[in-house]
Amino acid sequence: GDVKALLSQPGTADCDVIFGPLYTHQVKPLGDFCKQHDIRLVVPFSINGSDVCYNTNIYQVYQNPDEQNNAAIKAFLERFPNHHPVFIDCNDSTSKKGAFTFALRNQLQLAKRDYSITNLNNSEQMFLKAFSRTKPNIVILNTGRSPELNVAIAKLNGLVANVPGISISLFGYTEWLMYTKYQSANFHKFNTYIPTTFYYNAVNANTINLERSYSRWFGEPMQYAQPRFAITGYDHCQFFVRGIRHFGKNFCGYRSQQVKFPLQTPLSFERTFSPSKKEGGWQNKCYMLIHYMLDGGLES
């Protein structure tokens, strides 16, 4: 829709922060308005365009797929320097994970690190050949889908049963967080790492309290989704409103300026620059590796 009607409302120019817009074409007019009146514009949704690189008042939460892939690869290389990577081809013609696995393999080659490739349809004997007996193995599938994950875990369970002492961890995808209800035990068994920009913890006391309050306010539970959109909005609001109240004009959205611990969606902004190296706005760079530990614990 047209944002001009919103911008003409009394008091809008006096805001400290505006959350939105929903659509890419709304970013420029809203951004120009916010720059004119020195208002922070928070863009929480998936948009296209590079306005954030040219407007110092824009805070872009969304990280595009390339940025997320690069963050996941960086985290992988830092966390697993001594592991043997095993890529499993899951024969999923609909998968969009090829960009990630190709880029990761390329980085491993540049670092002169060995890795193996196997196929989900291989015999147990052929499947086993891809794994190291002397190093811990880190397994990467080339799909985020649940059916292929089920088959892979079944094959890995067979491997562990037949080869005592073999060490296997899984490196997954954000989609796997949707499967935790029935995969949690397997994630812990295989020391699983899931890269993500959010983590919904259903047993966190503060999360439970917010969900109860939400149901009381709106007469229905939060929408079942990963992430919980209501909690995303809550975290964003807490981050900016408390940050601005505490730091005033000095609030830039750095991780160190986080006043209240987020329930689900942490934020950490870094300054962007235009192609001509002129200062731009702020891009969220927060990224986590959720680790399902062998002892049943969780860490990030």
PLM regions and their residue ranges:
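Extracytosolic ligand-binding ectodomains
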Residues: 1-300
